[in-house]
Amino acid sequence: MSELVYKEESYSIIGLCMEVHNQLGHGFSEIVYKDALEFEFSENGIVYEREKEYPVFYKGNLLKHKFYADFVVLDKIILEVKCVKCITDEHESQAINYLKVSDNRLALLVNFARGKMEHKRIIY
């Protein structure tokens, strides 16, 4: 059995997401959960960037479109916050796009819209 990529780090991040969900419950918009996560990261001394911008290149040329990851945590894990009925293939594709342009290996998709927080690991 293979070892989980960034096991301890991802457990810490998911734990903070669970704390936010336990405190706020479901029903808020994404921005509220992002603000709460930013608070938790700061309170727990976890290094993060919010709305991290990633340029896209084609044949060495900068394209007009850029990607914006909700969070990059510990300079290596992308965290995408969702408030949707369920995590879909489109959400996973979005995370893969972020992984491709960032050269990171792990993205965490976290859905706060349900009574029980849903999360998914995306490895690239």
Give the role of each language-model region.
Residues 44-58:
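A short acidic/basic microdomain associated with nuclease active sites
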Residues 1-47, 117, 123-124:
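Solvent-exposed, charged helical/coil patches
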Residues 49, 70-72, 100, 111:
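Well-ordered beta-strand positions
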Residues 82-124:
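Nucleic-acid nuclease catalytic cores
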Residues 25, 69-85, 98:
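Conserved catalytic cores of phosphodiester-cleaving nucleases, focusing on short active-site segments
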Residues 62-69:
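Basic/aromatic recognition patch in beta-strand/loop cores that engages polyanionic ligands
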